[in-house]
A protein has these predicted regions:
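Conserved beta-strand element within WD40/beta-propeller blades
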Residues: 1, 45-49, 97-101, 151-155, ...
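Per-blade loop-tip surfaces of WD-repeat and WD-like beta-propellers in eukaryotic adaptors/scaffolds
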Residues: 8-21, 40-42, 51-73, 91-94, ...
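Surface loop/turn motifs at the tips and blade-to-blade linkers of beta-strand repeat domains
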Residues: 24-26, 74-78, 126-129, 177-180, ...
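Helix-rich alpha-solenoid scaffolding regions
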Residues: 26-30, 44
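Canonical WD40 repeat/beta-propeller blade segments in eukaryotic WD-repeat proteins
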Residues: 29-38, 78-90, 130-143, 182-193, ...
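A beta-strand-loop signature enriched in Asp, Gly, Thr, and Trp
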Residues: 172-176, 183-192, 200-202
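Conserved blade-ending motifs and adjacent loop-strand segments that build the rim/top face
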Residues: 176-187, 221-242, 273-276
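C-terminal, well-structured subdomains that either form a transmembrane helix-short loop-helix hairpin
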Residues: 233-260
Length: 276
């Protein structure tokens, strides 16, 4: 997105793996972040505006242009200010999003039904870390009956895991990420727990990509660092593959790196791509 204009691209198998613009749309007031809905909801993109507006978009016809598929939702943060990040929950938890605000407030929004054109509402809010901006979000990638929804929240002063307590009807802190000092967490991601006894998350902070294990009861999580990778420049993004076995990181030096655990449980770089 640039200047409120959002472009949608699709990989073209006939052009040696190149990408071609498929369509786009213009968001009045600009775009702070965007996110794809789960496939079960169809082809839907959510945009978070700096003015506090959450909008939902989809293809409108054969001409490739997109249009709004639901009335915009005003997601005014707890103390006002702009939105920074939006992420959809896994499909097992229904059609829901979490939106992070400049004031550190997280708003959880839900649709009445599993269609993006349904009516959306703000279901709940919580303050992630007082005195800091919330800049990145990652949902626990699975859920359902007996598994409480969880969110990993990165802020300008650190990161923590939050859990929805169905008994209390609100979000509560479930565990904090151990950092040596207050630091801005640029990005976070929660790995799918495929064949693992514990869950794994990753965060980007300063020149480092950190991998942490999450274990314990939902109400008292134990979060421990198990690997750290120093980069020659600030790390901007971290993302797991679909099986949660390989981590990708991008940094300010224009290089994307892949990290993987070997048979001895040791993590290391296995490949890198230099941007052009």
């Amino acid at each position: 997105a640039r200047g409120g204009e959002v472009g949608v691209f699709r990989r073209d198998a006939g052009r040696a793996g190149g990408w071609a613009r498929e369509g786009g749309f213009l968001v009045q007031g600009g775009v702070a972040d965007c996110a794809w809905a789960p496939r079960e909801a169809g082809t839907v993109l959510a945009t978070a505006g700096p003015g506090g507006e959450l909008s939902f978009w989809g293809p409108s016809g054969a001409d490739g242009e997109w249009a709004s598929v639901a009335p915009p939702l005003e997601v005014a943060p707890c103390g006002g200010g702009s939105l920074r990040c939006v992420r959809f929950a896994p499909a097992s938890q229904g059609l829901a999003t979490a939106v992070a605000g400049e004031d550190g407030c997280i708003a959880v929004c839900r649709a009445d039904g599993f269609r993006a054109d349904a009516t959306w509402r703000v279901e709940g809010r919580f303050q992630a870390m007082p005195g800091s901006a919330a800049v990145s979000l990652a949902w626990r990638p699975y859920g359902g009956e007996g598994v409480p929804p969880m969110l990993l929240v990165g802020t300008t002063k650190g990161a923590a895991v939050w859990m929805f307590d169905a008994v209390l009807g609100k979000w509560t802190a479930a565990g904090s990420v151990p950092l040596t000092a207050e630091a801005c967490v640029e990005d976070v991601d929660w790995a799918p727990a495929v064949g693992r006894a514990c869950e794994t998350v990753a965060i980007a902070v300063s020149n480092w990509a950190l991998i942490l294990r999450v274990a314990g009861d939902p109400g008292a999580l134990n979060i421990e660092k198990c690997a750290e990778f120093e980069h020659p420049a600030a790390v901007h993004q971290v993302e797991w593959n679909l099986s949660g076995t390989t981590l990708a990181s991008t940094a300010g030096d224009g290089v994307a790196r892949l990290w993987k655990e070997n048979a001895l449980g040791e993590w290391g770089e296995v490949a890198h791509v230099i941007g052009q």
